[in-house]
Swiss-Prot record:
UniProt-recorded name of the protein: tRNA (guanine-N(1)-)-methyltransferase
EC class name: transferase
Keyword Lipid metabolism in annotation: no
MF terms (GO), sorted A to Z: tRNA (guanine(37)-N1)-methyltransferase activity
Localization in the cell: Cytoplasm
Gene Ontology annotations for the cellular component aspect, listed alphabetically: cytosol
Naturally occurring in which organism (per UniProt): Staphylococcus haemolyticus (strain JCSC1435)
GO biological process: tRNA N1-guanine methylation
Stated family: Belongs to the RNA methyltransferase TrmD family.
Binding site for S-adenosyl-L-methionine: 111, 131-136
Length: 245
């Protein structure tokens, strides 16, 4: 996978891209990354990339020329996903991360001003994505967040593919509780089932714990999760148990 970032602050990506999983993915040549400072593509002597909005209003608007010119130098195809980081976009999710992990080329357009000239949105962008209902200074941090979520799903990036399959949201539920040594710590003990060696019982316990966690912390996810008849019975039994306690 090739990933390009159009940004006014390419140095912001250095720390994220040069450590941990993203660094290893590059070392394995599974991904290649490239930052492009689109200020280099400004068309006047002052390297101006923003201007006042037509019709008046607060703030500045990102000009179309630098972004269009920078995009011309990228080797795009019809399959290239050009992502605009903006609060108007569809909310980022594990499902979108999985979808984008299958792309061969992704371009992130990271703005840093009040808004974008609409022609950028309508003529260059394939996807508008938001990472939440809040405002950030620019699109760099959302692009980094998305990159991490996407790349770890590409086969071969993680040492153990089962790692991401057990993560929260990978199957629509939150992750089950995990424990390691020591077995007992300050009078807190590991559940016996995890030490039983019975893999079927362990898997059942983990699934039930995922249902419990999701019920308490993200009940909205259960509305979209394909609950089995056994799942529904377990949840009802758990609700009754809570009332009795």
């Amino acid at each position: 996978m090739k990933i390009d970032y159009l940004t006014l602050f390419p140095e912001m990506f250095d720390g994220v891209l040069n450590h941990s999983i993203l660094k290893r993915a590059q070392d394995k040549e599974i991904i290649s990354v490239n930052t492009v400072n689109f200020r280099d593509y400004a068309i006047n002597k002052h390297n101006q990339v923003d201007d006042y909005p037509f019709g008046g209003g607060q703030g500045m608007v990102l000009k179309p020329e630098p972004v269009f010119n920078a995009m011309k130098d990228l080797q795009r195809t019809d399959q290239t996903r050009v992502i605009l980081m903006c609060p108007q976009g569809r909310p980022f999710s594990q499902e979108i991360a999985q979808e984008l992990s299958e792309a061969e080329h992704i371009v992130f357009i990271c703005g840093h001003y009040e808004g974008y000239d609409e022609r950028i949105r309508t003529h260059l962008v394939t996807d508008e994505i938001s990472i939440g209902d809040y405002v950030l200074t620019g699109g760099e941090l959302p692009a980094m967040t998305m990159t991490d979520a996407i790349v770890r799903l590409i086969p071969g990036v993680l040492g153990n593919q089962q790692s991401h399959q057990d993560d929260s949201f990978s199957d629509g539920l939150l992750e089950f509780p995990q424990y390691t040594r020591p077995r007992e710590f300050e009078n807190m003990t590991v559940p016996d089932v995890l030490l039983s060696g019975n893999h079927a019982n362990i898997e059942q316990w983990r699934h039930e714990q995922k249902l419990i966690r999701t019920y308490h912390k993200r009940p909205d996810l259960l509305d979209r999760y394909p609950l089995t008849e056994d799942d529904e019975k377990f949840i009802e039994s758990y609700k009754k148990q809570l009332k009795n306690n």
